[in-house]
Swiss-Prot record:
ATP binds at S320, K321, T322, G323, S324, G325, K326, T327. This is Pre-mRNA-processing ATP-dependent RNA helicase PRP5. Its EC number is 3.6.4.13. The keyword Nucleotide-binding applies.
Amino acid sequence: MEPNTPAIDPKKERLARWKQKKQQQDMLRQKSGASSKSSHDQAEDGDAARSTQPFEGLDKMAERRKRLELWKKKKKEQDEQKWKGDDAGQESATDIPVKGKAAPAEDAKAVPRGRKSRKGADPEKRQIWDDSDDELEAPKLKLFKPGSTIQTETPPDEDPEDTLDTYMNTIQEKNEVQLLAPREVFDQEDDETTAFDYNRTDNGTGSEFMRLAKLKAKKQLKPVIYSADELKPFIKNFYQEPEEISKLSEEEVADLRLSLDNVQVRGRDCPRPILKWSQLGLNSGIMNLLTRELEFTVPTPIQAQAIPAIMSGRDVIGISKTGSGKTVSFILPLLRQIKAQRPLGGDETGPLGLILSPTRELALQIHEEVTKFTSGDPSIRSLCCTGGSELKRQINDIKRGVEIVIATPGRFIDLLSLNSGNLINPKRIVFVVMDEADRLFDLGFEPQVNQIMKCIRPDKQCVLFSATFPNKLKSFASKILHDPVYITVNSKSLINENIEQKVEIFSNEEDKFKSLIHWLALTQQNLNDEKTIVFVSSQQICDILYNRLEANGFTTFAIHAGKIYTERAWNLKCFKETANGILICTEVLSRGLNVPEVSLVIIYNAAKTFAQYVHTTGRTARGSNKGTALTLLMNTELAASYILMKSMRDEELNKHHDATVSTLKQMSEKFNKGLKTGEYRLVKGFGGKGLDHLGKVYEEKHTEERNQLALEAGLAATEVSVSAPDGGLGDESTSVSIPKLDYTVKKRSNPDGTSTYFAHVQVNDLPQIVRWEATKYTTLSSIKHETGCSITNKGRYYPSGQGPQGPSDEPRLYLLVESATDQDISLAIDLLESKVRDGVRKSNMQEIRSNKYTI
């Protein structure tokens, strides 16, 4: 054969050989005529002829019935062996999900359509047909049900003892095919599916099953099992607790959380909350973004507790209402974690952090917030991936590498499954956030979220934020999160639900006292024993109020720390035994007093802390009883209005007059603005403990006594122009001027081409106590720790009107502040000014102690 001669197709060669044999058989059949029979039929007729010689009177039909019974018996035995799992004769059989077809023999090259053997066909012809890829006519297929077995049967009129029939039956047994149930089709391997699709020529149920299987497998993510060598350990804990937070006692921490909208924590070793941003060790750029652009002057309650917990490396579940600052709570720790990670390599696409969102709109909103923090840092790239957006562009961005991906679950699964899972490698994901996790589960994303979590490394840090905490979320958290910390912020749960809160606002003390008499008169009309407790802020006010109520005909009992123990015990006993009794007391009884009959608590002097308000109102509605807590509020008590707005429920506010609610909101908003600017501060706990706090208590007590005594003398209460402790609780007016620090920020060029900034802060002319407070070692060291600036005392102190006489003399006392950025210097001076304000307050307290009060 010549080299260029093409090779003969084996299939065509086999077909030509079959046609040649068929022509020879046709010629033999024509020669023998109609009496020509196949070898099998000849054997059958020969047996019949031999049997009819000795038994010519027997009916041929009886013999055929006998052979049919023998065939059925043998067939039954073969079926039983098959169902028992005897696969000795079926090693070469292949189970393929076909519909009523016989598989090929051991040496077959292709899978032909199975057909019933025809009576009268010779064995040679049947072998040729078995090897053929062509058919003379289409076979009639049996209807089938998924899971049933259809096989090629041997006709009952053939001799079971014939050798050729036995051989052919063996082939039939090998080629029997059992149909697969729909659920079994999904489990077939890819090579079997390929063989099935190649050999089938009809569109039956099997092909439909395979089409559904491919659709199902398209979105399925296989769980990734990581080995210990693949996962490099990473640091989770980046938080160092500030010294001023570490010094707080457990009781003070509990009161601090109570003042932060009743923050409740559950879990092992939860870090303490922070009070200001500088306690997190943030750089000046982020500090400016938080305080100036985002207007978070101080951390919100969820931020104050959640950020230290997340930065400590703990898995966190944060429950807080929308708009409470949850986004910043996870962005800051996420950025800190990414900065600590090894940068993405040339063949790595990322991400390092993943944020899952239930909706496109929320994902875009989170992406915008992340962009605000990363716009000045080219090393951190973020990408928003949501359904409905252009997938091609997202793929191109991922190929270039991204550190943060904000995505909806469905689109992230699409990205994970692209390119056989090679587009995104989840091995580098170390930080996962699920924002609005309750909505993720409400919208049915639980299966997708579970798939994603099984692909990410098991030692990841996971954070969930939600407005509610349904059972589905609890179950998910128990499976995915490791030893989580639960943080719940809900100021509306401060007060017992059985207590109805009320408030009345007054512009003068006399109207407030008249309202007190009105409410007490109503209690005396009750037929049932319903007692009343009136809380005041000092012992002097308690005694004055007791005398005035006695003069108005009320039987009252008074208890405060100034009375001896026996008198206090006697008054308490009489109060419990007197029907509709009235008790006037100070905060000494705000905790632990349990009198079930108390139905009304009147807070005559408004509470100044959340803890004080919670415990005073808690003296009513003991057990399953119901009660009322009434606050008589002066229009200057802004801190109390803020506490009431945080504590009162919406349905309670709706029961009040519109003018009262409007005034209360205005007072609360004014105090809230003062909190952000630093003009006001909210006292934590019950006002502090120890000798350091005695000055504040002393000042507050005498200020209130002065106002009350002026009222008793019939004089108008004069305004006391003294700053209230901690920024003005009680009387909010502050007429003390806070000196502004004199400084200028300058830039210095270094020989190596770098630049530094410095400022001279003049402190020589500050009052002595203020100057000491601003320049002492603890003040400067804390500012250095929070800002990273260098602060040095320079020069010496000169009395007022004096100064250096010549160039050799030291300059007037000042602080030299140095840093690499001007933002750090501005932050350090802001902190220094806060210390100056503390010094001014201490100076004023000394003046108050040195003066005598005159009426």
